[in-house]
Amino acid sequence: MRRFLLLYATQRGQAKAIAEEISEQALSHGFSADLHCVSESEKYDLKTETGPLVMVVSTTGTGDPPDTARKFVKEIHNKTLPTDFFAHLWYGLLGLGDSEYTYFCNGGKVIDKRLQELGAQHFYDTGHADDCVGLELVVEPWIDGLWPALTKHFKSLGGQEDMSDSDTLAQASDAPLSMAMKPELLHIQSQVELLSLEDVGKRDSELQEQNETNKNQPSRIEDFDSSLVNSVPPLSQSSLSIPAVSPEYLEVYLQESLGQDENQASVPPSVDPIFQVPISKAVELTTNDAIKTTLLLELDISKVEFSHQPGDSFNVICPNSGSEVEDLLQRLQLADKQAHRVILKIKMDTKKKGASLPQHVPEGSSLQFIFTWCLEIRAVPKKAFLRALSDYTSDATEKRRLQELCSKQGAADYNRFIRDASVCLLDLLLTFPSCQPPLNLLLEHLPKLQPRPYSCASSSLLHPDKLHFVFNIVELPSNTTAASLRKGVCTGWLATLVAPFLQPNTEVLTADHSDALAPEILISPRATNSFHLPDDLSAPIIMVGPGTGVAPFVGFLQHREKLQEQHPDGNFGAMWLFFGCRHKDRDYLFREELRHFLKTGVLTHLKVSFSRDAAPEEEEEAPAKYVQDNLQHHSQQVARTLLQENGYIYVCGDAKNMAKDVHDALVEIISKEAGVDKLEAMKTLATLKQEKRYLQDIWS
């Protein structure tokens, strides 16, 4: 068996799932994948590795490698390593990213570049998969091309590797096809099953007959346009190439609960310390007629060891919506068993390599707890999940549609009706009523419910033992009922939690409602980042934060104000804030507080943009619609701050549009004011980022 080392670096499980898919496909191509997380350094050794290396690397934050790869990246960036340290190593790398972020696929690019600097060579070209348009558009063909690339690599080494009898038989059965085709076309033997309506085999013969019958009957769908449940030609008449079904590997037993005192998990598992803290204050920062509702919450951290500084972020551990969990269990016909304990075991005869129990499902927890606190039931189902669901769908039309949505031919429909529409499992089960998946399938495919990150919006110097954060209540259209809106998993939960004592925005600075009933939430620290005030207090800084992106900068300003009080003779650099919102009178967050900082001189320049109002007349506000416009209105000062005064620029907020537009504006500013072309301006920004003088805290 031809062995290769397969490493993944994952943040939320995406890279791991893709690596597992590669591992499962490897056997059918005569390869053996030695699969490990890159953090499991005790299980592999690149210094002595003789086989080819395949890596799948995701990206997190603002272009950083995932947390699981931090140690690995640090080790390979040791400056004492010689340039031929990995000269023996041949590798192929698949990077995952999102082009909505400035530093697309940077986690993979960092590792790729460093491996080459240390002498490693590609046996297969690097792939960059974009979650913005659909990872599968690159992932699937990259995996398809991996097998001929590995085959070519092993042939170039000469000789045949040892194989077991079963492996030899497997290869022999493939020999006619292999010999009849060029090596670069061998990927046709990959994991896909060619499901032709003319040649589907005995198991699907009844479905084929039903499909033929359905063609001659009136459609039960009024809308003849393509939709989640309905396809149109040519897709509806095409033969389909669909993924091979992933081997099931879990056995699930439901054990009747012995009573409420029975020992079970009360907190979802986490590698980070978890703190239970009360919400001491909740303030609505926007007016009732604002397009988005923004809340400020204050946490009382006086009883826990939770240190933080302005610019830090932290995680809120949140549950799924109780009503959604109830609806899902009802649809799965498990509502009467929601208090039962879930016992998991690995199937004795599973074909899944390296099968293990999901670490995010605590042993002996109730069914309701698992679906409420452990599983991301809002996750958009991947194609492998759709493929598995199709096997448990009895209606021929519904089964065919699920197969279309996970097929190569149905990629456009998948993106439009599943991915872009943020369809979740409950949506699918309500749309395809004959789909009756077993519980083990859901536990195998639903990912871990992730904590939600929030920026600290306060300074411990001004608010000791308190922690502020700000968020918009996210509203999403529901795919199950046309008129309803779903709230964000975490923001909707928090809004409901604080509704009984939510205060209007009268005076954020001094209002205190700690005497109200204080619900408690779970929080955990996040890995430290560099989004902090510079150590050199005399360095000028530019802060760009529209909407809730202003949150960390309020903490910056609070911190700076207290430092100036403590050091009245200190040399403090200028502070610019570029803030933006829709309406001056509806969603101008922290308006009075920002004006206070401007009046006291802590904030040197406040430039505010109102995208939906007529041009403002007040002196501190420039007539620009967006923060990037305001930056360009002050291009000379911005360029001087960054290029001549060794200043810092911080950008916080939406990655999809704002962060890109701000980046483009900075390129134009540097190009114009420094008299260089745009390529040189981009290099200058890259240098600023490397020097940690251009810092981003952005989200999608």
From Swiss-Prot:
Principal localization?
cytoplasm
Q: Name one GO biological process term.
A: homocysteine catabolic process
Which molecular function terms from Gene Ontology are attached? [methionine synthase] reductase (NADPH) activity; FAD binding; flavin adenine dinucleotide binding; FMN binding; NADPH binding; NADPH-hemoprotein reductase activity; oxidoreductase activity, acting on metal ions, NAD or NADP as acceptor
Name the positions where NADP(+) binds. Answer: K292, S611, R612, Y626, V627, Q628, D661
Q: Which InterPro entries does its entry note?
A: CysJ-like_FAD-binding, FAD-bd_FR_type, Flavdoxin-like, Flavodoxin/NO_synth, Flavoprot_Pyr_Nucl_cyt_Rdtase, Flavoprotein-like_sf, FNR_nucleotide-bd, NADPH_Cyt_P450_Rdtase_alpha
Which residues does the UniProt record annotate as the domain FAD-binding FR-type? 272-534
UniProt keyword annotation of Repeat present: no
Catalysis: reaction(s): 2 methylcob(III)alamin-[methionine synthase] + 2 S-adenosyl-L-homocysteine + NADP(+) + H(+) = 2 cob(II)alamin-[methionine synthase] + 2 S-adenosyl-L-methionine + NADPH; 2 cob(II)alamin + A + 2 H2O + 2 H(+) = 2 aquacob(III)alamin + AH2
Residues in Flavodoxin-like domain copies: 4-147
Its protein name is Methionine synthase reductase
- Which lineage is the organism of this entry classified under, starting from the top rank? Eukaryota, Metazoa, Chordata, Craniata, Vertebrata
